[in-house]
From Swiss-Prot:
SUPFAM superfamilies: Pentein. It catalyses: L-arginine + H2O = L-citrulline + NH4(+). Belongs to the arginine deiminase family. One of its GO terms (cellular component) is cytoplasm. Its EC number is 3.5.3.6. Pathway: Amino-acid degradation; L-arginine degradation via ADI pathway; carbamoyl phosphate from L-arginine: step 1/2. NCBIfam families: arcA (TIGR01078). The active site is at C398. The lineage of its organism: Bacteria, Bacillati, Mycoplasmatota, Mycoplasmoidales, Metamycoplasmataceae. It is found in: Cytoplasm. This is Arginine deiminase.
Amino acid sequence: MSVFDSKFKGIHVYSEIGELESVLVHEPGREIDYITPARLDELLFSAILESHDARKEHKQFVAELKANDINVVELIDLVAETYDLASQEAKDKLIEEFLEDSEPVLSEEHKVVVRNFLKAKKTSRELVEIMMAGITKYDLGIEADHELIVDPMPNLYFTRDPFASVGNGVTIHYMRYKVRQRETLFSRFVFSNHPKLINTPWYYDPSLKLSIEGGDVFIYNNDTLVVGVSERTDLQTVTLLAKNIVANKECEFKRIVAINVPKWTNLMHLDTWLTMLDKDKFLYSPIANDVFKFWDYDLVNGGAEPQPVENGLPLEGLLQSIINKKPVLIPIAGEGASQMEIERETHFDGTNYLAIRPGVVIGYSRNEKTNAALEAAGIKVLPFHGNQLSLGMGNARCMSMPLSRKDVKW
């Protein structure tokens, strides 16, 4: 039985809010057990997660998605299914790329040992799990100076970032930090080999070596992409993306809007500052007000290489130019919140909700004031506990990549 249900016809995402049909997630595996205090900054975590509770919280998140009739695809299952369906050449290539990309860099001797260890796995799922989790000297039964022979990929539960669904295509990303760059191995593999994904157009490729991550990529409607200029995504990357989209005749977007946000390491993407939750409702952090800056790319009349043109509108005017109506702007923690309340709920990704249909969102229960403000604005909130998951610095949007949404009737 395929990880995809019978309704799935390929990547189809033309909004942030259309009814969610199919979504990619990843329950944190053994990889989070290899986070140590000395490596928190390097591995991009604010604290060590309590593994059992983190997995319990993620299961609650997935259960809420399934309760809303959403086809939930687990990343391990997708990669394992792709591996089973792939040619022997593609299987070998996956393992060789894993060995070449490994951190720490493997000696030739260790490459042989790790290759044999991986190929000895009895099931494709077991193989994928160990590739994601990291490999220790105890796994291999060898002597070495360090316990980890291959580092873990502990950020994989943030499935939003390695690639983004854009219309009927994808952008596969070059991620800012080395610890996350290895994650795109799995994105490249499934989109190159899975029968239901192999014909998906690519609008960006990690070989382009300019940083972009999925938390900065938004599809506001059929015409407009919105991309964050953030701690992880550069304006020159957006310019290259605009060029690629214009060159690809399968892509029909007419405009890209780039939005500058604070360059904070703990709030690293646009979706930690501003999100679209309904046809006219947007949630934002007031902390970003003095930093917001906007650029327009004209994909219709901007030539083969559209350039950014600074847009001097305020946030409200910019959003109105996209949705053609006055937007409702909801601040984190609600109107009249104290600076302390705004800072606390911004810190725990208070904008980072996942819309599962117009005006219905899922996110952490801990951001109580923001949840109340959304309910007061007519947004239905489906809360779940995320006290451990949030220590990885992401909320429901970060932990999900929509693969298919129904089109919105605007």
